[in-house]
Design a protein with these regions (language model features):
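Aromatic (Trp/Tyr) and acidic
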Residues: 1-33, 41-185
Length: 185
């Protein structure tokens, strides 16, 4: 809504909602500059959904104002989803083909052996404290294939796993996938 209100003819309304967009982006940017991946998103459930939301917000702000201040963060957020992250893996199921991507998402399709959620954006990393408090999560992979725990690459602060039984970091989400589709279209 802020994007549309920022483009109305009424200058008072337009300025107010442009300021609202910039303020939200700036708060994320202030955290991002402390991260080597320029990623200032909190690592809560569905952190990749938040990443795509901020990615889209940066683009809409840039298109509305012509202000390139946050273009580098926008690129870093996009790149995070495609593998420029501590694990070096894409967060999109089966993309890039023959690359490192979520191959064992928490999905009933995969569990039943009838296919995969190709193109789905997975939840993304969560704070280690969240992951360690969960029940029923394990690194068991699909039969015959162990899950990928990325143990060598796990930062102290957060975790991500490519294992079918990790519903906290590796479950594809429709809303995150839709947001990413919007950005990429």
């Amino acid at each position: 809504g802020h994007y549309h209100l920022a483009t109305v003819d009424n200058q008072r309304i337009s300025k107010e909602f442009t300021r609202n967009m910039r303020t939200g982006i700036e708060r994320t940017y202030e955290k991002a500059v402390e991260n080597p991946f320029l990623h200032g998103i909190p690592y809560i459930w569905c952190s990749n959904n938040l990443t795509t939301a901020m990615l889209t917000q940066c683009r809409l702000y840039r298109e509305t104002t012509g202000d390139e201040t946050y273009a580098e963060m926008e690129a870093a957020l996009r790149d995070w989803l495609f593998g420029c992250n501590p694990w070096g893996t894409s967060m999109i199921v089966e993309l890039p083909l023959y690359g490192d991507y979520p191959s064992q998402p928490h999905s009933s399709l995969l569990n039943a052996g009838v296919g995969n959620t190709t193109g789905g954006l997975v939840d993304g990393p969560v704070y280690r404290s969240i992951f360690e408090s969960l029940r029923g999560v394990n690194m068991t992979g699909i039969p015959g294939t162990p899950g990928q725990d990325y143990e060598r690459f796990q930062p102290d602060l957060m975790v991500y796993h490519d294992a079918i039984h990790d519903y906290s970091t590796n479950e594809p989400t429709m809303d995150g996938t839709a947001c990413l589709t919007y950005y990429l279209s």
